[in-house]
């Protein structure tokens, strides 16, 4: 592994532990050349997954794109980065469990909204307002009512 400090290819692992419920290995490394310590993460390489967008174009699945969209919806809300990462993990796991190589962006949006509804109501409404592109107040109110119904059933 190249040292990010001196760019030499001589490092040794000084600590290794599973993270992310065993799906990732966190390794603490030390460069044998300059002594710089750094962290790396190892995870299983997943098969490529393509997203079919609304206009029919295809692009590679991006965890970062989902994370950025959810983070924007959760701005100034009491939602931790750990919760956001877990949400994205859950969405990706549910997609991969389907065993498909392509998925519609609409399906991804629904999976995100399903997960987000359990985390924060306001973030859910924010995400839904962009994702569903509300054109009138009645569609917005319908989403609000659905959210309120979901809460009353949960109690």
Curated annotation (Swiss-Prot):
Residues spanning the signal sequence: none
Keyword Transcription regulation: yes
A GO BP entry: negative regulation of DNA-templated transcription
Cofactor note text: Binds 1 zinc ion.
Keywords of the record: ATP-binding, DNA-binding, Metal-binding, Nucleotide-binding, Repressor, Transcription, Transcription regulation, Zinc, Zinc-finger
Pfam families: ATP-cone (PF03477), Zn_ribbon_NrdR (PF22811)
unnamed zinc finger segments: 3-34
Recorded GO MF terms: ATP binding; DNA binding; zinc ion binding
Start and end residues of each ATP-cone domain: 49-139
Highest taxon above the source species: Bacteria
Reported cofactor(s): Zn(2+)
Entry's family note: Belongs to the NrdR family.
PANTHER family the record matches: TRANSCRIPTIONAL REPRESSOR NRDR (PTHR30455:SF2)
Family matches, as HAMAP family: NrdR (MF_00440)
Function noted in UniProt: Negatively regulates transcription of bacterial ribonucleotide reductase nrd genes and operons by binding to NrdR-boxes.
Protein's name in the database: Transcriptional repressor NrdR
Origin species: Lactobacillus delbrueckii subsp. bulgaricus (strain ATCC 11842 / DSM 20081 / BCRC 10696 / JCM 1002 / NBRC 13953 / NCIMB 11778 / NCTC 12712 / WDCM 00102 / Lb 14)
Gene: nrdR
């Amino acid at each position: 592994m190249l040292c990010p400090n001196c760019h030499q290819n001589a490092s040794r692992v000084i600590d290794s532990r599973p993270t992310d419920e065993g799906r990732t290995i966190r390794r603490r490394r030390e460069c044998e050349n300059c002594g710089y310590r750094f962290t790396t993460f190892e995870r299983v390489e997943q098969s490529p997954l393509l997203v079919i967008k609304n206009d029919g174009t295809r692009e590679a699945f991006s965890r970062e794109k989902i994370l950025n969209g959810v983070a924007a919806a959760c701005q100034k809300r009491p939602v931790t980065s750990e919760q956001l990462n877990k949400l994205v993990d859950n969405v990706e796991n549910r997609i991969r469990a389907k065993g498909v190589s392509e998925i519609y962006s609409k399906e991804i949006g629904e999976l995100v909204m399903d997960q987000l509804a359990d985390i924060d109501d306001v973030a859910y409404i924010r995400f839904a307002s962009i994702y569903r592109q509300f054109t009138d107040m009645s569609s917005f109110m319908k989403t609000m009512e659905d959210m309120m119904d979901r809460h009353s059933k949960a109690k």
